[in-house]
Curated annotation (Swiss-Prot):
The chain crosses the membrane at residues 40-60, 125-145, 178-198, 225-247, 269-289, 327-348. Solcar repeats lie at residues 34-153, 172-256, 266-355. It is found in: Mitochondrion inner membrane. GO terms for biological process: import into the mitochondrion. It is a multi-pass membrane protein. This is Uncharacterized mitochondrial carrier C16C10.1. InterPro entries: Mitochondrial_sb/sol_carrier, Mt_carrier_dom_sf, Mtm1-like. The keyword Translocase does not apply. GO terms for cellular component: mitochondrial inner membrane; mitochondrion. Keywords: Membrane, Mitochondrion, Mitochondrion inner membrane, Repeat, Transmembrane, Transmembrane helix, Transport. PANTHER family: FI19922P1-RELATED. Gene3D superfamilies: Mitochondrial carrier domain.
Length: 360
């Protein structure tokens, strides 16, 4: 039996005024303004633009780190292409062709950008981007498309509830955005984690596809499916609260800015400012979880005792070694990295959706 919202019948408005009834039916029939294919195109375009803007900054950061303290063979380091972090392992056989091991005498970020572009070519600023985009692009597309559809569906249900059952309490719209963000992120990380683990193994040990097949079978035989989710728990410890806070904040900031600027608001500017602000808020609140996640993941490839440490033990070790300040270290660099990434990705995603909707 369809609900009044699904059927759209005005006879179920329970005596509400006709204008309110019509508005309620319109609200309950609301659909996404763009199709799934257009969402995929918009998120892909936004992801590419984001990575093109953000990758040079991380390439320079890694080159500066390598210059100060060269990576020992087998050591893990993080590569961030603006969309997601990738655990990279310094190759066991050093080759001059590895981009992060190229010599350089850099005196800072600006100096590094100029020298890399001048002596190695402008394309060197995007070193390592192609292999990481193989993972980041589908993960980002899946994440944004899932979020968008789930968020619209939840908000539609809430709108119907307010219209047809005003006596009942209904959660605010930002809560729908938070739930949709959490669910979408959980699914995306769960799907991507095993593939990312295999990619890291292939990169670090130069394994062939036959050797990868043997590794998968032996891992399944010894530890089961959990062997492919070694970093899942610490990742979700950070990503679940971050996604919830980010999307709730983005929805709130965007709604308030649209209301203040009126119908003539610039959708790109509103999305950019809202995304940047939401990214800052989410980063501040979830930074301790990010530090814990990093400390958990850098143990991968270490001793057996280090790898088998629980999250609780890792937290205790961090507190005993540096006190409460251990959980706030690196906040400013993370804000510099995350806030513009969020702003660029969401603004271009919304902009491309707007273009598709306008053309449609």
């Amino acid at each position: 039996m369809p609900s009044p919202c699904e059927s759209g019948k005005t006879t179920n408005c329970s005596g509400a005024p006709s204008s309110s009834c019509a508005k309620s039916v319109e609200c309950c029939k609301k659909q996404l303004s763009v199709g799934v294919l257009q969402q995929v195109s918009a998120s892909s375009s936004g992801a590419i633009v984001t990575s093109l803007f953000m990758t040079p900054l991380d390439v320079v950061k890694i080159r500066l780190q390598q210059q100060t303290r060269p990576f020992p063979k087998g050591e893990c380091f993080y590569y961030h292409n603006g969309l997601m972090e990738h655990v990279c392992v310094s190759c066991e056989v050093r080759k001059p062709c590895e981009w992060y091991q190229r010599p350089g005498n850099f005196r800072g970020t600006a100096d590094a950008i100029v020298k890399i572009a001048r002596h190695e070519g402008i394309r060197s600023l995007w070193s390592g981007l192609s292999p990481t985009m193989v993972m980041a692009l589908p993960a980002t597309v899946f994440y944004f498309t899932t979020y968008d559809n789930l968020s619209v569906w939840l908000k539609k249900k809430m709108c119907c509830r307010r219209a047809f059952s005003p006596e009942k309490w209904t959660p605010p719209d930002w809560s729908a955005a938070a739930v949709a963000g959490i669910v979408a992120r959980t699914i995306a990380v769960t799907v991507v984690s095993p593939i990312e683990m295999i990619r890291t193994k292939m990169q670090s040990k130069r394994l062939t596809y036959h050797e990868i097949g043997h590794l998968v079978r032996s891992s399944m035989a010894t530890k089961g499916i959990s062997s492919f989710y070694l970093g899942w728990t610490p990742t979700m410890l950070r990503d679940i609260p971050f996604s919830g806070i980010y999307w709730a904040g983005y929805d709130l900031f965007k709604t308030n800015l649209q209301r203040r600027q009126g119908p003539d608001h610039n959708p790109f500017v509103v999305s950019f400012v809202s995304g940047a602000a939401a990214g800052v808020v989410a980063s501040i609140f979830t930074h301790p979880f990010d530090v814990i996640k990093t400390n958990c993941q850098i143990r991968i490839g270490g001793s057996i005792d280090d790898m088998n440490k629980s999250i609780t033990t890792v937290i205790k070790d961090m507190y005993h070694s540096r006190g409460i300040s251990a959980f706030s270290s690196g906040l400013v660099p993370r804000l510099v990295k995350v806030s513009p990434s969020c702003a660029i990705m969401i603004s271009f995603y919304e902009y491309f959706k707007f273009l598709f909707q306008k053309n449609h």
